[in-house]
Amino acid sequence: MSLGGIVDAILGKDDRPKVKGRVILMKKNVLDFINIGASVVDGISDLLGQKVSIQLISGSVNYDGLEGKLSNPAYLESWLTDITPITAGESTFSVTFDWDRDEFGVPGAFIIKNLHLNEFFLKSLTLEDVPNYGKIHFVCNSWVYPAFRYKSDRIFFANQAYLPSETPQPLRKYRENELVALRGDGTGKLEEWDRVYDYACYNDLGEPDKGEEYARPILGGSSEYPYPRRGRTGREPTKADPNCESRNPLPMSLDIYVPRDERFGHVKKSDFLTSSLKSSLQTLLPAFKALCDNTPNEFNSFADVLNLYEGGIKLPEGPWLKAITDNISSEILKDILQTDGQGLLKYPTPQVIQGDKTAWRTDEEFGREMLAGSNPVLISRLQEFPPKSKLDPTIYGNQNSTITTEHVQDKLNGLTVNEAIKSNRLFILNHHDIVMPLLRKINMSANTKAYASRTLLFLQDDRTLKPLAIELSLPHPDGDQFGTVSKVYTPADQGVEGSIWQFAKAYVAVNDMGIHQLISHWLNTHAVIEPFVVATNRHLSVLHPIHKLLHPHFRNTMNINALARETLTYDGGFETSLFPAKYSMEMSAAAYKDWVFPEQALPADLLKRGVAVEDLSSPHGIRLLILDYPYAVDGLEIWAAIKSWVTEYCKFYYKSDETVEKDTELQAWWKELREEGHGDKKDEAWWPKLQTRQELRDCCTIIIWIASALHAALHFGLYSYAGYLPNRPTLSCNLMPEPGSVEYEELKTNPDKVFLKTFVPQLQSLLEISIFEVSSRHASDEVYLGQRDSIEWTKDKEPLVAFERFGKMLSDIENRIMIMNSHKSWKNRSGPVNVPYTLLFPTSEEGLTGKGIPNSVSI
């Protein structure tokens, strides 16, 4: 430095060019209501010189021929004087970079080092006026822990997307090293500051150390129990079975490892409370049990059930109530469970009974919910009569249906069965084959007595579905090889026969709720998406355009899945309230055997189920055979919008099929996704090769569809329909009342009590309703389809304009949904219960709304 420069430095003069930056972050005390002193401690560290530094990395000038040139460190200014209230959100800090007189070029990334003692959530860095360039924006959205926690530097890249081959040379090594850090080395227990994405089987569903009764099969890694992989945690193995992973004690269940950036990042406290409650619901069990002990384990009338919503029920005084008030905050009790904090439990009235308390019992509503309810993805067209089973007859004997022409002929509006089949008027809700293989073991439980069901329906002239017959089957008492013992029930509305028909429909609903929760919802959205989350972070750099496309659709998925494993799907969790009981996850593994990735596309699914046929003259290339099928009608519009958006996006970055084929990150991603993430399916011929732009478009469209619209359609109607459990019971405690039994005689005098005793046990009902109500809520910071959490998510203008078009398409779909819902001619859109179909309405407000399509499987 010259003498003049030394003098200037002493006098505080510095004529070197400066570049101003603006950093937006959230301090730990904003997002951690327990450790509210974190910001003060970090302020003291800052005062003592332990600051937060940033070094820019040139994206155009090499330092040593390989890596981009580094700027001198610059430090966040005024940390100590920035006093952020607990309720506040973002904090903004200035940072000033000395601009080297030598050519630095254009910054393409930066290294940040946190020398404080606590982590913070870094949202973005914006360089306001880079010489010869202008503004540069870095989207970060990541937790930055103290530097000593990391084995490598924390690096963030500017919001310019690059294919691997197009990455500027100075950034390539940084890009590669970041992916290496995210992959980890596959060893050791992972801690909260680790950023490692890796795979594991579902080997943490049981607790074999507590005894054989608490053991559960390992899902994944075998032909008997194939399953998608989950994120690895590296917890210690159990003592009883070294192949099983130990579990956290319940109070620590929120601490299960997921990469820190995958954890909930809610800003609003009530959203945090709701998330916490997902792991605290087990605390309610003792109080619920006490309540049920005081008023033995059943409701006596439908008025008792309605009182849960209209008046509330008093939880008994004692240690149980104290356990609730000690372990669950008053905000949760008041805002989420709607108690008064003094033990009065009250739930919001579900939509299905808001307008009419009894319309749910009608046959029309029973059929309508197969098209517009919470599980509208199972109904299929009947193509052979009687229905035949696909179960192996050498193992299970004759499993074909016993429904005959005589059961249905007089209900077909003058058509014969063959004529009804040929005219596409017969449909089936078929639970038989997925339930029957486990039913003998399920029914050995003291609390569960279920059937395997088939339901036949007729499509009427007004486009509603009329149930014709319900077949309920049990395993043959002499052994599986002897087939089934089946009985067929037909509609009736008076006397004991009418009550029996209501029972038959309820047994169908029990099957449907179990399959809905375990297969349609959990397996086919939550579980199958997690390997995509892991593979994307391991192999697609944040610079990669496909990472930028898919990343919003993975928000919070690993975290909610980890919570589900800890509190819902494990032994003693949610399975206690579903009819398959301890065999719940085993049933979902059986269903995964038939999972086919290309068939998750909505048009392919509708064709497979026979509810649509190919028709190139139709808007979506297929024609629905049930014109008033709200899920399919709205779903096809959403599907087409997603496909259009993905097509435009992919064409911008991939100019030819060769570009797809030679994308090293993309090919590594797809290879590992097939061979590791969905490793039990790796040899299936149906996997796309991902060699063309069309294959890339189709795969990304399916991924986004599953994570957004499919999940929304299957999840956010849960409380609307199943919040009133008589409509969608999850358990059946007894078999059908038979003539001569006490229950059959009681049907003559008090059929409602027998129904409730069979299908709505108090303890399980209270737990179920609590779970449904909490999990059906939208957070205040939810990001919906067609939205991004940052408007500057990419620098490329063409994708931004295409994304605006996507948002406009979704807005138009909202308007069409509202118009169709207002037309009474579309009977299935509201039905006898007058609940408009809004589950595929793209946007929503906060809370319990029964509408809205979040970008991701986030709850």
Swiss-Prot record:
Alphabetically, the GO molecular function entries are:
linoleate 9S-lipoxygenase activity; metal ion binding; oxidoreductase activity, acting on single donors with incorporation of molecular oxygen, incorporation of two atoms of oxygen
Q: Which UniProt keywords apply?
A: Cytoplasm, Dioxygenase, Fatty acid biosynthesis, Fatty acid metabolism, Iron, Lipid biosynthesis, Lipid metabolism, Metal-binding, Oxidoreductase, Oxylipin biosynthesis
EC top class, as a word: oxidoreductase
The subcellular localization recorded is: Cytoplasm
Major place of localization? cytoplasm
Lipoxygenase domain location: 161-859
Q: What is its EC number?
A: 1.13.11.58
List, as start-end ranges, the regions of compositional bias called Basic and acidic residues: 233-244
Protein task: Plant lipoxygenase may be involved in a number of diverse aspects of plant physiology including growth and development, pest resistance, and senescence or responses to wounding. It catalyzes the hydroperoxidation of lipids containing a cis,cis-1,4-pentadiene structure.
Q: Which family does it belong to?
A: Belongs to the lipoxygenase family.
Q: What is this protein called?
A: Linoleate 9S-lipoxygenase B
**Species, as recorded:** Solanum lycopersicum
Q: What is the lineage of its organism?
A: Eukaryota, Viridiplantae, Streptophyta, Embryophyta, Tracheophyta
Its gene is: LOX1.2
